[in-house]
């Protein structure tokens, strides 16, 4: 199934995110009336968001509110604060649930047996890349990071099959990273992708894909400063697992 939302489905998802506290109490008919969309649109949107249906989505929200987050000491908390907390909670929980253990194991092995590990990242994702660089170096791994677009493209053409590359990209469409990934793909260089976009171009070129959940809305819509929380979660799990594995050896 194509997970890309249509214009109407995107409108609905934005409506849901802006009314996230009320949604658990809505029926599908009421949501249809409030958002002025058909029930069929609601069902399609839920499917694309990897839910079985609207009831499944509501169940997830209720579970998150009643079990994972305790608001009992914040009875009068501002709705905006609650919405922000729930949005972050959703990114954490769904990212963890989406991770495939087999891919994490493959990534650990790829890093372990590489002579050198290169981390490529741009923009806000550079912060995640920097953390990965430091932690890999602390385990004794020969690792380096590059953020300059021209250097990234140049180095990607000089790697050997004994190297591995980690691409860190929220949307997986950054041009210089795509170019570098294609170079690695053509030269059969091992690659790992940390992203939050299931259908990205980078995903097509990378050998091992670790994909997290990214909420659609942004509280800073005029700027490219979207949350990298899903990438942070993936990076931490991968690096913690790698460090534990190296400690066992």
Short names for language-model regions:
Residues 102-114:
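Glycine-rich phosphate/diphosphate-binding loops that line cofactor/substrate pockets in enzymes
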Residues 112-233, 237-246:
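Glycine-rich phosphate-binding loops that contact phosphosugars or nucleotide phosphates
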Residues 1-2:
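Short, Lys/Arg-enriched N-terminal segment that forms or immediately precedes the first helix
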Residues 5-8, 18-25, 33-39, 45-105:
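HTH-adjacent hinge/linker in prokaryotic transcriptional regulators
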């Amino acid at each position: 199934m194509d997970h890309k939302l249509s214009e109407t489905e995107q409108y609905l998802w934005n409506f849901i995110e802006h009314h996230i506290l009320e949604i658990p109490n809505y029926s599908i008919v009421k949501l249809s009336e409030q958002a002025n969309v058909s029930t069929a649109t609601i069902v399609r949107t839920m499917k694309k968001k990897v839910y079985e249906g609207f009831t499944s989505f509501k169940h997830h929200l209720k579970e998150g509110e009643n079990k994972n987050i305790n608001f009992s000491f914040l009875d009068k908390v501002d709705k905006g604060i609650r919405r922000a907390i729930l949005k972050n909670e959703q990114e954490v929980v769904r990212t963890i649930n989406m991770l495939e253990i087999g891919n994490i194991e493959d990534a650990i092995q790829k890093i372990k047996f590489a002579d050198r590990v290169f981390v490529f990242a741009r923009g806000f994702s550079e912060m995640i890349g920097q953390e990965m660089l430091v932690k890999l170096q602390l385990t004794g791994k020969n690792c380096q990071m590059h953020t300059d677009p021209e250097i990234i493209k140049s180095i990607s053409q000089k790697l050997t099959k004994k190297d591995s590359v980690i691409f860190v990209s929220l949307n997986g469409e950054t041009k210089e990273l795509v170019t570098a990934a294609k170079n690695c793909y053509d030269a059969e260089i091992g690659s790992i992708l940390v992203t939050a976009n299931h259908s990205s171009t980078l995903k097509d070129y990378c050998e091992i894909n670790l994909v997290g959940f990214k909420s659609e809305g942004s509280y800073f819509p005029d700027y490219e400063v979207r949350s990298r929380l899903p990438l942070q979660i993936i990076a931490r799990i991968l690096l913690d697992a790698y460090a534990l594995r190296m400690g066992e050896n």
